[in-house]
């Protein structure tokens, strides 16, 4: 028998990587789940979440870059007739290479996934949370948001937006019983760099953080109601230095890590 008193969480980008690990952590900590991704693998991942402890797992294959795709996810959660206790807005997409060498349709897809789709889903779910005066929101930003990202200009720009948006929304909701936390990981061992076409870069070929560790860090921060959390001590040092380093210097440093072929230098 399903226990409807269990909290319900929505996790986006949950088929692989940080989103997958976030959903696992939620399942192990008593949450039921509505999970979404733009690939059929989300249904296979849903089985892992059930084994981890979630009694109810609704898997939604949908395009999170579109309002229609996010409506599909929102309606799937609403159909359960249970309040959403937590929204983990993790879906994101990267894109390497110089901005003028990128296909603009791919540029638009990054912006639509990372920013427009994320904001649209938050707008829908957070309204319900505000009406109930209860809820938790975790937004996956990035330490990339602190750095002008040469050869990752659009991606870093989207993460800078999310990092700032999260704090603004948190302030707007501080009297509403709804917390907003932004998780800011550094390079993490996922399929991100392969999908972004960055395996030949220094950052793509370099050592990365463990996705399970990053997810646990973010989940714990969300449950505490923290404003932000940078995962990993090296990333904490990087963001601290980024705050006092000229933007031009940061962009030049990023070039060394993200320029195509930099893995061979």
Residue positions per predicted region:
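Conserved glycine-rich cofactor-binding loop
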Residues: 15-16
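Conserved glycine-rich Rossmann-like NAD(P)H-binding loop of the short-chain dehydrogenase/reductase
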Residues: 29-45
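Conserved NAD(P)H cofactor-binding loop of Rossmann-fold oxidoreductase domains
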Residues: 90-95
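Substrate-binding pocket helix/loop in short-chain dehydrogenase/reductase
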Residues: 98-111
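Active-site helix of classical SDR
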Residues: 122, 158
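Residue(s) in the substrate-gating loop at a strand-loop-helix junction
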Residues: 142
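C-terminal helical subdomain
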Residues: 182, 202-239
């Amino acid at each position: 028998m399903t226990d409807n008193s269990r909290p319900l969480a929505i996790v986006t980008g949950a088929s692989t990587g940080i989103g997958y690990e976030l959903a696992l952590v939620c399942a192990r900590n008593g949450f039921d789940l509505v999970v979404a991704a733009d690939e059929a693998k989300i249904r296979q991942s849903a089985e892992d979440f059930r084994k981890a402890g979630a009694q109810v797992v609704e898997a939604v294959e949908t395009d999170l870059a579109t309002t229609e795709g996010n409506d599909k996810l929102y309606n799937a959660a609403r159909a359960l007739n249970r309040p959403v206790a937590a929204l983990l807005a993790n879906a994101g997409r990267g894109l390497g290479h110089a901005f003028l060498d990128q296909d603009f349709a791919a540029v638009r897809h990054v912006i639509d996934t990372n920013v427009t789709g994320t904001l649209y889903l938050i707008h829908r779910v957070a309204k319900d949370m505000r009406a109930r005066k209860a809820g938790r929101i975790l937004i996956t930003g990035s330490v990339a948001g602190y750095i002008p990202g040469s050869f990752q200009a659009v991606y870093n720009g989207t993460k800078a937006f999310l990092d700032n948006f999260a704090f603004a929304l948190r302030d707007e909701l501080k009297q509403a019983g709804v917390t907003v936390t932004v998780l800011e990981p550094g390079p993490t061992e996922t399929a991100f760099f392969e999908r972004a076409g960055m395996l030949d870069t220094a950052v793509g070929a370099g050592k990365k953080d463990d996705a399970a560790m990053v997810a646990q860090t973010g989940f714990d921060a969300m449950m505490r109601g923290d404003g932000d959390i940078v995962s990993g001590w090296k990333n904490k040092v990087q963001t601290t230095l980024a705050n006092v380093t000229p933007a031009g210097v940061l962009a030049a440093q990023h070039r060394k890590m993200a320029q195509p072929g930099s893995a061979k230098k």
